[in-house]
Amino acid sequence: CQLPLAEGQRFLEMHESDKARLVQAYRANGMSGKPERLQRRYDHGRRCFAIEEGERIVAWFWALHGVPRYMDEFAWQIPLNETQVWLRDAFVVPERRGRRLLLAMMGAGVTVESTPMEYFSDVSVSNRPSLRAHAAMGFSRFATVHSLRFGGSRWWRSLPPEGLPAPAQLRPDQKHLRMSADEIAWHHAQIA
């Protein structure tokens, strides 16, 4: 689904040198926008795409392409090959919602690479607007997974669903996970 951007809007990739603008956009919308966390996203090979109106960033999302997706809620590191893309953390500023801007932005995003791609995304089941937008983009739900964390080192979690690239970390075949100190340190280093 590709929708045109409105007049005065421009689709662009936000590079590491644009991090201060991203921090400002996050904070202007009530999010922490921690520079060190955004830096880790770039360090882990993630790419950020946005829509700009004038000098203002009004929407953005992150894409992982050929780099692993770490789902810290499950302690799963999911490898992605060169034909797989994980889209995450899409955001549209409140005053621009309801204008199908997310669809236009994602439509522009899928044209960035010429290689045929398989797209993945994760959405909270309580985020109905995002679920509707994902459905409009052609995504379909293939699994619902759950996790519960106890303290800093123990998880109860679903097993990875079939159809998802098989997670490589941390012991994805175990529903009950208790991490060692080294695993906890590794886990924290992956969160971005």
Task: Give the location of each predicted region.
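Conserved GNAT acetyl-CoA-binding A-motif
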Residues: 113-125, 145
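Conserved active-site alpha-helix within GNAT-family acetyltransferase domains
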Residues: 125-145
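Conserved N-terminal entry element of GNAT/NAT acetyltransferase domains
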Residues: 1-21
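Conserved acyl-donor/pantetheine-binding loop and adjacent beta-alpha core of acyl/acetyltransferases
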Residues: 37-48, 52-89, 156
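Short, positively charged
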Residues: 19-35
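Conserved acetyl-CoA-binding loop-helix of GNAT-fold acetyltransferases
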Residues: 86-112, 132-136
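Anionic, Ser/Thr-rich low-complexity intrinsically disordered regions
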Residues: 62, 120, 150-152
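C-terminal "cap" of GNAT-fold acetyltransferases
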Residues: 148-192
